[in-house]
Amino acid sequence: MATHTVQPRTTKVARAPRRGAASRPPGQRALVASPTTWFVWAGVAAFFVFLVGILVSVVVDSLGRSWFGSWLPEQFTFSWYAAAWERFGMANVIGVTLLVAVTVIVISVLVGVPAAYLLARRSFPFKRTISLLFLLPVLMPPITYGIPLATVMYNMGLGRTLVAVILVNLVPSVPFVIMTMTPFIEQINPAIENAARMSGARMRIVFTRILAPLLVPGILAAAVLVLVRTVGMFELTFLVSGPQSDTLVVAIYRAMTAAGGGESRPLISSMAVVYTVTMMIILVIALRYISPTQLVARVKDSRDD
């Protein structure tokens, strides 16, 4: 009689997930505390401590009545802001800064977007050379072409005027919009335009009613970058501006280098705080209405369509 040997059945016990792995989203790696990781985080922390320390020192200096040989001023006051507002005409300076920035944005978009469309959709001789020429004002230091520009402005009788400030800031801003919008337009499916043309739509209708809504995220992103660049542009503005056409960053420099050793340090710090707050407001508004993730997603959707 044959006997059958029954092998004992072995069951695999599922290994319990490591602590914290269940709560981690799929595809996300755990932070490994390697020496390189600690070194990177230490560098980031040191940078932020240094940056925050500078900002705090400027703010405290703008609020201190007297600050000599101690960690904090003896008294705090807002009178330096009122004095700087009256002394340097901050209302006019901020108004000029915003006027220059908005004008440069509008002209740069009106000129740069059609030019970017031509570079993205049309083939013509010396196209690559023209694209490289547009890159030069963006890549070169502003002072290298700022001095010849200033010479031209003064020879034309536009020196120390608001018109000159706007014109010189357009030189890097228009190519910047072109270089920003060209790859953005290239990602839009050309079949959308071809379908509209086959339906009898003219080029103006195609551009304003079909392409324009798709280009809005890219235009807003380019406009914000031009805004930040124009407000912070010192070299070109300084070379052609005057007392009534100084932007905020140039006004700060003139206050620091005024005759007699410059203005009081708390006054300069007050102007620096106003400039920093202005730039922060611009960035907050930009991040509020422009999301890089949504911008890329919208371009991808239009490409897939």
Label every model-predicted segment.
Residues 53-56, 60-63, 110-114, 147, ...:
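Membrane-embedded alpha-helices of multi-pass transport/permease systems
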Residues 42-43, 48-55, 178-181, 189, ...:
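Transmembrane alpha-helices
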Residues 91, 95, 99-111, 115, ...:
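Hydrophobic alpha-helical transmembrane segments of multipass integral membrane proteins
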Residues 2-23, 28-29, 37-42, 64, ...:
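C-terminal transmembrane helix and the adjacent membrane-cytosol boundary/short C-terminal tail
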Residues 25-30, 69, 78, 126-127, ...:
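Membrane-interfacial helix termini and adjacent extracytoplasmic/periplasmic loops
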Residues 37, 99, 125-131, 194-221:
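Amphipathic cytosolic juxtamembrane alpha-helices at the membrane-cytosol interface
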Residues 30-36, 66-69, 81-89, 231, ...:
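Interhelical loop and adjacent transmembrane-helix boundary motif
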Residues 31-32, 102-134, 151, 287-288:
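Transmembrane-helix boundary motif in ABC transporter permease subunits
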